[in-house]
Amino acid sequence: MTVTTSSPTTAEGRTPGIGRVARVIGPVVDVEFAPDELPEIYTALHVDRTIDGETAVLTLEVAQHIGDNTIRAISMQQTDGLVRGAPVRDTGAPISVPVGNATKGHVFNVLGNPLDVDKVDAETYWPIHRSAPAFDQLESKTEMFTTGIKVIDLLAPYVRGGKIGLMGGAGVGKTVIIQEMIRRVAKEFGGVSVFAGVGERTREGNDLFLEMTEAGVIEDTALVFGQMDEPPGTRLRVALGALTMAEYFRDVQKQDVLLFIDNIFRFTQAGSEVSTLLGRMPSAVGYQPTLADEMGALQERITSTRGHSITSLQAIYVPADDLTDPAPATTFTHLDANTVLDRAISDLGIYPAVSPLDSNSRILDARYIGQEHYDTAREVQRILQRYKDLQDIIAILGIDELSEEDKILVNRARRIQRFLSQPFFVAEQFTGIPGKFVPLDETIDSFRRLTQGDYDHLPEQAFFMCGGIEDAEKNAENL
């Protein structure tokens, strides 16, 4: 495992050299070095810049060798105040971030500097550019990751060490699901979470930190932010920094890790900006020609090694709701499951507002989850799909015009729909309802009996915001 040291040397064992700034165009900086001192691609460089009498150190990352002993680098900060001829120090190593327990409960930038405190006592730093695990280190079996959230476990089960897309608009509950998953990993499984804020609003990042602190889940979480006001180089690398922290928890501390990336589209967008700045010819719809390669370099590191895993939950913005856009389409090829949040369900007050018909998973298959689970999930989806097909008729003619069989099915579907709601631990302070973790066996059995009509005699409202079927029976007694 690679760990940076206090006195870096290059891969060839030589002492890093000193270069000079030759040109500055926005975040792109060309630097001249002596012929035998050219730094390698991805090497971090340091240069001083002065604004209003205050000197600060800029970090650059080598992106290209452009000839004439010159490299082209991307700055991780604003380049205001940088002048031609300024000395540039080769660090001899890539950008490195702190790893280990010292990162828990803190917020970092792409360079590994803490944003919420002055300093963290980290003993180990790892470079953000790392290889994916070797093939013989990977976990060969496919295993379900039980969340204790009924709608997810039943209809769109997550894969341990897999990649899950979380799609939804503003205000439908993405942040609450993220907080709940962080809490469940920490409390139910003794795991740790890492959050990467990629190109999102600074206000949202601040709100998330404060809400997680209030909910009591911050102590088991490391957060890394590169927000939308940052240069494109920062937004392109922040996900790699967070992933590096997650890899340490998996490989060294032997923990299961949940990695959140919000928003993976901004990662692609930043790559497009950097590609244009470097003068590369754009590809389809103006995206970078290296889109698939950049996405693969990130996604292939998110996996299970023997006995331990990084499970990733990635928020996905879909431009103009076009699923064929190259950015989301490239992401979809790596995903094991999609959790789609539906505003229509949110408007009904049903949370989590997960669409049972649009969400999917590659392991919703009897080979992976067992025949009973598969049959129950498909029957639930069949009933809900039929209910959806009948809604236009109900709206125009009324429910009385349906056949007796369809009336029974509609009433059953409404009970199932409400039973898919569930109180969350992190929302207790708002709802006043204690959070519930529902074991998978109980979830399957409850929905199997629901689809068979065993609970048709209970009122609809009894199924709203409850954990297991026992809660529904208790609610019915109180109605």
UniProtKB/Swiss-Prot annotation:
Enzyme nomenclature, EC number: 7.1.2.2
Q: What reaction does this enzyme carry out catalytically?
A: ATP + H2O + 4 H(+)(in) = ADP + phosphate + 5 H(+)(out)
Asked if the record carries the keyword Lyase, the reply is no
As recorded in Swiss-Prot or TrEMBL, the protein's gene is named atpD
**InterPro entries found in the cross-reference section:** AAA+_ATPase, ATP-synt_VA_C, ATP_synth_F1_bsu, ATPase_alpha/beta_chains, ATPase_F1/V1/A1_a/bsu_N, ATPase_F1/V1/A1_a/bsu_N_sf, ATPase_F1/V1/A1_a/bsu_nucl-bd, ATPase_F1/V1_b/a_C
Q: Where does ATP bind?
A: G168, G169, A170, G171, V172, G173, K174, T175
Q: Where in the cell is it found?
A: Cell membrane
- Subunit info? F-type ATPases have 2 components, CF(1) - the catalytic core - and CF(0) - the membrane proton channel. CF(1) has five subunits: alpha(3), beta(3), gamma(1), delta(1), epsilon(1). CF(0) has three main subunits: a(1), b(2) and c(9-12). The alpha and beta chains form an alternating ring which encloses part of the gamma chain. CF(1) is attached to CF(0) by a central stalk formed by the gamma and epsilon chains, while a peripheral stalk is formed by the delta and b chains.
User: Where is the major localization of this protein?
Assistant: membrane
**This protein's record includes keyword Transport:** yes
Annotated function: Produces ATP from ADP in the presence of a proton gradient across the membrane. The catalytic sites are hosted primarily by the beta subunits.
Name of protein: ATP synthase subunit beta
Membrane-crossing ranges are: none
- Record's GO cellular component, any one? proton-transporting ATP synthase complex
Name the top EC class: translocase
